[in-house]
Regions:
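Extreme N-terminal starter segment of soluble prokaryotic enzymes
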Residues: 12-14
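Compositionally biased, low-complexity repeat tracts
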Residues: 2-3, 18, 62, 71, ...
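Active-site nucleophile-His-acid catalytic modules used for acyl/amide transfer and hydrolysis
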Residues: 25-33, 79-135
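Glycine-rich catalytic cores of cysteine/serine-nucleophile enzymes that process amide/ester linkages
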Residues: 19-88, 125-129
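Residue-identity detector for glutamine
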Residues: 4-5, 36, 105
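Short, Lys/Arg-enriched N-terminal segments with co-localized hydrophobic residues
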Residues: 1-10
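Short, functional N-terminal and low-complexity linear motifs
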Residues: 8, 65-74, 89, 106-114
Length: 135
C-alpha cells in the first residue's frame, strides 16, 4: 500500500516477461537491433499462467499473428530449450491494473483491430512513419 494525498492506495503487480525465442523473426530482430530480448509479454499473475502479447496465433507458423495468449508449456516455449528471458514486476495502482486488464481483454476480443504487421516492423526499425487506418 502507498499513500497519496492522504488516501491509502493498494497496489497490484503486472509482470513484464522479455524473451528471445530463437525463431526466424526473433533472430532477424536480434541481428538488426542487437537487443538482448526480442519479444515482450504481459502477465497478470506471478506464476505466469497466461501471457499476453502480439505474436503468432499458431505456435508453429509465423503467420497469422496478432494479439495472442501464450503459455510456458506450449508453442515456442515448448519447442525451444534455454530461451533467454527476463522477468520484471511492476507495481501499479489497482486502477492502473484494472485498466491494463480491460485493455488487454479488449485487444484479445477484438484481435482483428490489432493485427501484427511485419512490414510495419521493418519500417519502424528504419524510422519510417506509416499511417494506417485504426492505428
Amino acid at each position: 500500500m502507498s499513500r497519496q494525498h492522504g488516501e491509502t492506495t493498494t497496489m497490484k503487480t503486472l509482470y513484464i516477461f522479455l524473451t528471445r525465442s530463437g525463431t526466424l523473426l526473433s533472430n532477424l530482430v536480434y541481428r538488426l537491433t542487437g537487443a538482448q530480448y526480442t519479444h515482450i509479454s504481459l502477465a497478470f499473475d506471478e506464476d505466469l499462467s497466461c501471457l499476453y502479447s502480439s505474436t503468432r496465433k499458431n505456435g508453429y507458423t509465423m503467420f497469422p499473428a496478432g494479439p495472442s495468449r501464450e503459455y510456458l508449456n506450449r508453442g515456442v516455449f515448448l519447442m525451444r530449450e534455454n530461451i533467454p528471458c527476463a522477468l520484471y514486476a511492476l507495481e501499479v495502482t489497482d486502477e492502473a491494473y484494472i485498466r491494463a486488464k480491460r485493455r488487454t481483454q479488449h485487444m484479445m476480443h477484438h484481435g482483428e483491430l490489432y493485427r501484427f504487421n511485419s512490414l510495419g516492423l521493418l519500417l519502424c526499425w528504419m524510422h519510417i512513419r506509416w499511417r494506417r487506418r485504426r492505428h
